[in-house]
Amino acid sequence: EVKLEESGGGLVQPGGSMKLSCVASGFTFSNYWMNWVRQSPEKGLEWVAEIRLKSHNYATHYAESVKGRFTISRDDSKSSVYLQMNNLRAEDTAIYYCSTGFAYWGQGTLVTV
């Protein structure tokens, strides 16, 4: 059974920082690109960031709205992916999900700015 479990959300002041984590199980984590996506009433579902494989030198890509503020990373030894969020804004308020190429999703973690 594939499981993705996010953590690290909560309430943060504008301009603050927060780090989200996602632990995966039930599949070979190191073989999958990983994404963070978010959902808010105002913007709906929005892709945030992607990190590729070791064979791709862990290449990363970001939505324009978060570029320069958010950093995605992964630790294949821990089957985990992370999202470091800096200089948070009110418009970053959303439920954040990790996903494997949109095939599998976690339950989400709420970030309120």
Curated annotation (Swiss-Prot):
Keywords: Adaptive immunity, Disulfide bond, Immunity, Immunoglobulin
Example of a GO cellular component annotation carried by this entry: immunoglobulin complex
Signal peptide start-end: none
Gene3D superfamilies linked to this entry: Immunoglobulins
Organism field: Mus musculus
Note: This chain was isolated from a myeloma protein that binds inulin.
Family annotation (Pfam families): V-set
UniProt-listed SMART domains: IG, IGv
Entry's Gene Ontology BP terms: immunoglobulin mediated immune response
The protein's name: Ig heavy chain V-III region ABE-47N
